[in-house]
Curated annotation (Swiss-Prot):
Positions of region (Repeat 2): 159-222
Renumbered residue ranges of the record's region II: 611-802
Gene Ontology molecular-function annotations: ATP binding; ATP hydrolysis activity
Transit peptide found in the keyword field: yes
Residues the entry annotates as binding ATP: 282-289, 685-692
Source organism: Arabidopsis thaliana (Mouse-ear cress)
Localisation per UniProt entry: Plastid, Chloroplast
Region called Repeat 1, residue ranges: 82-147
Domain Clp R: 78-222
Entry annotated with the keyword DNA damage: no
Induction details: By heat stress.
Main location: plastid
Protein name listed in UniProt: Chaperone protein ClpB3, chloroplastic
Amino acid sequence: MATATTTATAAFSGVVSVGTETRRIYSFSHLQPSAAFPAKPSSFKSLKLKQSARLTRRLDHRPFVVRCEASSSNGRLTQQEFTEMAWQSIVSSPDVAKENKQQIVETEHLMKALLEQKNGLARRIFSKIGVDNTKVLEATEKFIQRQPKVYGDAAGSMLGRDLEALFQRARQFKKDLKDSYVSVEHLVLAFADDKRFGKQLFKDFQISERSLKSAIESIRGKQSVIDQDPEGKYEALEKYGKDLTAMAREGKLDPVIGRDDEIRRCIQILSRRTKNNPVLIGEPGVGKTAISEGLAQRIVQGDVPQALMNRKLISLDMGALIAGAKYRGEFEDRLKAVLKEVTDSEGQIILFIDEIHTVVGAGATNGAMDAGNLLKPMLGRGELRCIGATTLDEYRKYIEKDPALERRFQQVYVDQPTVEDTISILRGLRERYELHHGVRISDSALVEAAILSDRYISGRFLPDKAIDLVDEAAAKLKMEITSKPTALDELDRSVIKLEMERLSLTNDTDKASRERLNRIETELVLLKEKQAELTEQWEHERSVMSRLQSIKEEIDRVNLEIQQAEREYDLNRAAELKYGSLNSLQRQLNEAEKELNEYLSSGKSMFREEVLGSDIAEIVSKWTGIPVSKLQQSERDKLLHLEEELHKRVVGQNPAVTAVAEAIQRSRAGLSDPGRPIASFMFMGPTGVGKTELAKALASYMFNTEEALVRIDMSEYMEKHAVSRLIGAPPGYVGYEEGGQLTETVRRRPYSVILFDEIEKAHGDVFNVFLQILDDGRVTDSQGRTVSFTNTVIIMTSNVGSQFILNNTDDDANELSYETIKERVMNAARSIFRPEFMNRVDEYIVFKPLDREQINRIVRLQLARVQKRIADRKMKINITDAAVDLLGSLGYDPNYGARPVKRVIQQNIENELAKGILRGDFKEEDGILIDTEVTAFSNGQLPQQKLTFKKIESETADAEQEEAAFSK
């Protein structure tokens, strides 16, 4: 037997004489293997005629091999003269004959083998003509079923005369078309003159030889069969690409709003003589692919220069091109076929490669050329017009490393659109999303989607994240509409529950059960009436909405037909549709909308059918975890109440809080420079007076979460080289890929409060980074990315000059004005910080030491936090003014501010409460009164004031709880 690398030859020979009649016997026979095709088809195992012993005995008692001249040249049918798909069908045809118990392999068996090939060329040819392949296969099978059958091993062992003649005709077609191998299309053409089966089949399906040739020509293009796998290269663009212009013509692409400058620049580059290849570079989600779709729509509408008129824009699918390429060189063959089709079109086809960085290195194994190197010559000479799209990071990582490839592309930067532009884009897409989901989308929802996504969803880019919000909100509403309403669902469950109860009571005979049964039956009648009413109402509402959606879909289809008619200058058809069908549909739509609106306004409606701003806020809340109520609070309300909200958390420091609130209000009203941060402050004062607390309060109120506070401790930046930690390590150093501590945080969360704590402790060179942040609102990180600080509030804290504040006695502090103290502190700051740094800070705010009264207020704030923690045990703390005064006096120290208060409360309140709970003195739902008492004079010790903890009687506690609930 032949090995996998050798091939067997099927030979047919001999004329056998029986009496006066001469008969030609056709049989497959294993001869000496030759190097053409693997000798493993199962149907060729019976090639020796010892398996046809009965036939041999009839002719001659001597054993011999029957042969027949089936080939005009060497008497052999070899794989070398056929393409792989053609040979596969020839090898499969004996199997078809064997399955149908037929001895002679004929043309109908070959036709069935051709039609059963997955993605076969024969199927593509018939589809091109407009013939249903399934029906052709059914007709072939019917013909096969009518042929005589034989039983035994002889099935499928002989080659028919008509099949032999078909091979001869196929060879002739190969010569006529100047091909090197007999391919599937030659075999299909040969069926046109097949007197046994093919001619009648083609006649039944009205297939002529001319239509076959034109279909083959459109599939093959200008290609010739020069290797044994040409079928895989036919219509390569159709197989591995999507025609964007065809999709635009059919209305399958979403409208592209704006982006006129980028599309115009692409057209400009495509119109060049050489290097006419734009590459769209931008962050993911900014609309790079949409620009190519916008160009396709313009080509279809004829809104392009003559150089691009009637061109085809094909999007190449690199995944499909690489997938399934098992052997070395197969991927390159596919790509070459695609490129050949593009170049043969003589500029009629423009290629669009999304994620073009995948081309670099694609297909390269063990020194083989990658796809990028195959593209370079064509890109440089202008033979291939290609539009690429990739992100900034991937462009830098892959394409910039290959300068020869990079210089063949012209860069087109695609920036993130503004919030206003995003709203325009959403308005343009609204109709498509309304049509898909079958709901209405309000304009307020679109505005909310753009604003909230920009403010709260970091790490993603507009318009993609805003479109996703609208899409998800519409999907959520659609799900609510299609599922059963809550009221009806509860009613159904009540009916089922009562039905089960009625069944269980049916067999009980006692009086109570009977009465209960009667009550249940009465209740069931009422519930079922209500259920039927609600079900009818729900079905009616759904039917109105589905009718509305079907009318909208019909209007969309008619609009598409009008556009096509106008493009083809069929003005009669366009006018008929526009003033006939469209007007009629518009009237129906208005009537249906009026009916639905009346139904909704009547108050009977069981669900909403419009996406509102609250729906968008709910989705943002799900994505980010920020409470919905805070998301929906308007910006204006926040700004108006900013000062009083800050005072709730920051005790005293009126000048500081007022200055911060005014700076924020000024910025948000649009009176500040849009190219700078919202505001920049330098908080100066002694420790523990509320500098960091004010920054936390501002972040929490402005951006709805304390996590929006980015705190950077400047004591970690005391060395000169530490500045690289802020903006990222330079190339070649450890941590280059990770980015900077400051820049990465702001890129991920652009709306934030940045707190640089203890700024005077940083090295002098660190301040050089702050200069451009404070002045231009941006900084360039180590990887060349520009990070914007225009939506941040920058706060720096410093203890510089605190000695001037603390050294004043209470009397002096009253005499000295705030401005005098501030002037002294500023002079101290000027001696430390450079003038160019100080000149860029918006406002310097000096914090004064806290007095006794303010410390007492802080005590109450800290005790409120203790109360929150102990509330889990359902306990309540009541504290007297005397106890607050005592804690205030214990925690008061002008040099340390409010920080000692926390320690005093921990030692005197929390420790005692913990001991009382562990001893069992205080239990759940107990009220605890914290008061003071004066100790008696004993053992020479003076009387002292100390805290006492008493358990309040339960009645008193209950009364207090009731009073508190009533007041709430």
